[in-house]
Swiss-Prot record:
Similarity section: Belongs to the SPC24 family.
Protein's name according to its UniProt entry: Probable kinetochore protein SPC24
CDD domains (UniProt xref): RWD_Spc24
SUPFAM superfamilies in the record: Kinetochore globular domain (SSF143026)
Sections of the chain in a coiled coil: 29-127
Predominant cellular place of this UniProt entry's protein: nucleus
UniProt gene name: SPC24
GO MF term list: identical protein binding
Cleavable signal peptide: none
Any one Gene Ontology BP term: chromosome segregation
Key words, A-Z: Cell cycle, Cell division, Centromere, Chromosome, Coiled coil, Kinetochore, Mitosis, Nucleus
Gene3D superfamilies membership: 3.30.160.430
Organism classification: Eukaryota, Fungi, Dikarya, Ascomycota, Saccharomycotina
A GO cellular component entry from the record: Ndc80 complex
Top-rank taxon: Eukaryota
Length: 204
């Protein structure tokens, strides 16, 4: 590096100017500066790479944690949905059991009412005086109690507005509100005795 400006005599002699210029520069010092600068750049790049690697690792860990939390939240949501479905199914099952029990009780009551009705008709037939219609029938005394009970049932149904159509195996029900006549099949396996009885009584 130059330490001082060349004097007038040196400018007049170019050879002396070159020699003096070489003497004023320190190559060793400049090499040290270059080496130091290169070392600083190397350390700076190394530190930058370390920070980048650390940042990338932390970002990867954060992404992994976020993925795990999202999966855990989805699993909890699915579990809650499954529990809700199980609870709903259990509630429906309990309702079905309750309705089945109620239906069974109603059918038992229907059977009991039928038995009481048959017994009452039989007693009425045994204790009542023969009607005018049966007095003129010579074969009435030959009829069995079952036939007599069935005849009494037919009379009762007829008095309530129910007519049996034996030709078509159906019952004709005259509605109590004078809205017309309803029909119900008597030999339809898809209809239970409970349904038939309820259907008839609802329309009387």
């Amino acid at each position: 590096m130059p330490s001082q400006a060349p004097g007038p005599d040196v400018l007049e002699n170019p050879a002396d100017l070159l020699r003096q210029t070489r003497e004023n520069f320190s190559i060793a010092h400049d090499l040290q500066l270059l080496n130091a600068t290169e070392e600083n750049l190397r350390r700076l790049m190394q530190r930058t790479q370390q920070l980048e690697a650390k940042g990338a690792q932390e970002l990867s860990e954060l992404q992994a944690q976020q993925t795990e939390r999202a999966q855990a939240a989805e699993a909890m949501r699915a579990e809650k949905e499954t529990q809700a479905q199980h609870l709903q199914a259990l509630t429906h099952s309990q309702d079905l059991v309750r309705l089945a029990n109620e239906l069974e009780e109603l059918e038992q009551q229907l059977v009991s009412l039928r038995a009481e009705l048959d017994e009452g008709m039989t007693q009425l037939l045994q204790t009542s005086e023969p009607t005018a219609a049966f007095q003129g029938d010579a074969e009435h005394e030959q009829q069995s109690p079952e036939v007599q009970t069935n005849l009494l049932k037919l009379q009762l149904y007829s008095s309530l507005g129910v007519t049996l159509d034996t030709e078509h195996n159906q019952a004709l029900i005259e509605r109590g509100d004078a809205a017309g006549i309803d029909l119900i099949a008597l030999e339809d396996d898809s209809l239970s005795p409970f349904f038939r009885t309820k259907y008839v009584w609802d329309r009387l």
